[in-house]
Amino acid sequence: MDLIQTLEQEEIARLNKTIPAFAPGDTVIVSVNVVEGTRKRLQAYEGVVIAKRNRGLNSSFIVRKISSGEGVERTFQLYSPLIASIEVKRRGDVRRAKLYYLRQRSGKSARIKEKLA
């Protein structure tokens, strides 16, 4: 392991974040810290994980949800200080690592089967 990887591992250990195991197809609730002026509050963002990028400290994931009939996608950095918590609501049974095809689908065709056990 080279120096950069070692530093990234130390930084991840220092952050001490508990991140649940989740994969594309899973429905997650991401609690985000939102600062509005002097007020600070938590905002829940619930949707389906359509992509996950594992790059150590630079890991990220994309969550897609339908908000008032319009598809909304948001990219989150996994180790961001803005993320308060990640909760897995249900596990999805998919055969792809990237679910970008869900962007073209709507309604019943965009449903994902639930993983049993």
From Swiss-Prot:
Keywords: Ribonucleoprotein, Ribosomal protein. GO terms for biological process: translation. It comes from the Bacteria. GO terms for molecular function: structural constituent of ribosome. SUPFAM superfamilies: Translation proteins SH3-like domain. InterPro entries: Ribosomal_bL19 (IPR001857), Ribosomal_bL19_CS (IPR018257), Ribosomal_bL19_sf (IPR038657), Translation_prot_SH3-like_sf (IPR008991). Pfam families: Ribosomal_L19 (PF01245). GO terms for cellular component: cytosolic large ribosomal subunit. This protein is located at the 30S-50S ribosomal subunit interface and may play a role in the structure and function of the aminoacyl-tRNA binding site. Belongs to the bacterial ribosomal protein bL19 family. This is Large ribosomal subunit protein bL19. It comes from Methylibium petroleiphilum (strain ATCC BAA-1232 / LMG 22953 / PM1). The lineage of its organism: Bacteria, Pseudomonadati, Pseudomonadota, Betaproteobacteria, Burkholderiales. The gene is rplS.
